[in-house]
Amino acid sequence: MQAITLEAVKRETGKSAARRLKNQGYVPAIMYGKDMTENIPLAVEYTKLQKLLQKYGRNVLLNVVVNGTTHTALIKEIQEDTLKGKIIHVDFQRVSMYEEIEATVPLRFEGIGLIESKGGIVQHQLWELTVESLPDKIPQEIVVDLSHLEIGDTLFVKDIPVPEGVKVLDDPEEIVVSILVPKEAGEEEEEEGEGTAEG
């Protein structure tokens, strides 16, 4: 994963400073992590951050440039205004390129349409995996192909292939997806079975 450059500026703290930043088109942020003695309050341009997230997702390796100094970092947390759907704060975690870290990676499911065409219902139990790897090995997403599954099948964490150098920390026996028979069809089969037994 190639690091993407994002410029940031140091900011003042406090509510009035936060309002001023917002009016200027910035979103407050903070950086903490590897070899840092104190957290750095930052601000980044809202539109640039939004475009970056839309293009690369949240699991993007960043070169955060602050006053000419480059910090290798990941986005650790994003706070959003759920009503307005806007980002209100970002946490950057500075990392070492030579030390493994934990990250949460979303799952993208393919083949759902094929299962539904067979009459199956896809029941999701897990939408993301917790992984451990070097920062540049963290995938933006993990693709899960469901097209080979049949009604009644179950997909576990251990069944999901991940890139080389990535270790999954979730329980291998945890269920990710189950393929269910439609409820009505199941009820009809039960009723037919009962009718046969009575006859």
Curated annotation (Swiss-Prot):
InterPro entries: Rbsml_bL25/Gln-tRNA_synth_N (IPR020056), Ribosomal_bL25/Gln-tRNA_synth (IPR011035), Ribosomal_bL25_b-dom (IPR020057), Ribosomal_bL25_C (IPR037121), Ribosomal_bL25_long (IPR001021), Ribosomal_L25_dom (IPR029751), Ribosomal_uL5_bac-type (IPR020930). Belongs to the bacterial ribosomal protein bL25 family. CTC subfamily. Part of the 50S ribosomal subunit; part of the 5S rRNA/L5/L18/L25 subcomplex. Contacts the 5S rRNA. Binds to the 5S rRNA independently of L5 and L18. This is one of the proteins that binds to the 5S RNA in the ribosome where it forms part of the central protuberance. Keywords: Ribonucleoprotein, Ribosomal protein, RNA-binding, rRNA-binding. The keyword RNA-binding applies. GO terms for biological process: translation. GO terms for molecular function: 5S rRNA binding; structural constituent of ribosome. One of its GO terms (cellular component) is cytosolic large ribosomal subunit. The lineage of its organism: Bacteria, Bacillati, Bacillota, Clostridia, Thermoanaerobacterales. Pfam families: Ribosomal_L25p (PF01386), Ribosomal_TL5_C (PF14693). SUPFAM superfamilies: Ribosomal protein L25-like. This is Large ribosomal subunit protein bL25. Transmembrane segments: none annotated.
